[in-house]
Amino acid sequence: MIVGIGNDLVEIQRLTNMLNKGHGQRFLERCFTQQEQQLCNGRSTPQRACCYAKRFAAKEAVIKALGVGFRQGLWFTDIEVLPNQLGRPTVTLHGATAQWLACHHPGQVNIHLSLSDEKGLAIATALIECHPLAMAPS
């Protein structure tokens, strides 16, 4: 069963500006996990903002796919976007976001994610599917 589909578009220059301002570190700590920060900070200067922009777009896309928005105690850092061994972007949910999904959609959940960038824009599309737990025989 499809839980939802979400997408988001982020202007990379906007993230560059945020990172270069005095509150850039606070923004990173509020929106990205330590592992995400390590990944993006390891990139060259031009690619650093793009890395963050893709992950920010991905987090927004996942929240849109959940259909709840950032409320009910859900945080950006509850959604972690990292590459797997082959470089494919994967989503791991933590905290209240993971609890909300498990409560409202029990079963095996798969989050499919696509990230891209072109001409100063980063885009993410997320599709969340849930295979409900089999009902126990009566």
Curated annotation (Swiss-Prot):
Reactions that this protein is recorded to catalyse: apo-[ACP] + CoA = holo-[ACP] + adenosine 3',5'-bisphosphate + H(+)
Catalytic EC class: transferase
Statement: the UniProt record of this protein carries the keyword Protein biosynthesis: no
UniProt-listed Enzyme Commission number(s): 2.7.8.7
Keywords tagged on the record: Cytoplasm, Fatty acid biosynthesis, Fatty acid metabolism, Lipid biosynthesis, Lipid metabolism, Magnesium, Metal-binding, Transferase
Keyword Transport: no
GO terms of molecular function: holo-[acyl-carrier-protein] synthase activity; magnesium ion binding
Subcellular location: Cytoplasm
One Pfam family named in its UniProt record: ACPS
GO process annotations (BP): fatty acid biosynthetic process
Domain of life per record: Bacteria
GO cellular component: cytoplasm
Main location: cytoplasm
Binding site for Mg(2+): D8, E60
UniProt xrefs under SUPFAM superfamilies: 4'-phosphopantetheinyl transferase
Protein purpose: Transfers the 4'-phosphopantetheine moiety from coenzyme A to a Ser of acyl-carrier-protein.
Family: Belongs to the P-Pant transferase superfamily. AcpS family.
Protein name in the entry: Holo-[acyl-carrier-protein] synthase
Species assigned in the record: Magnetococcus marinus (strain ATCC BAA-1437 / JCM 17883 / MC-1)
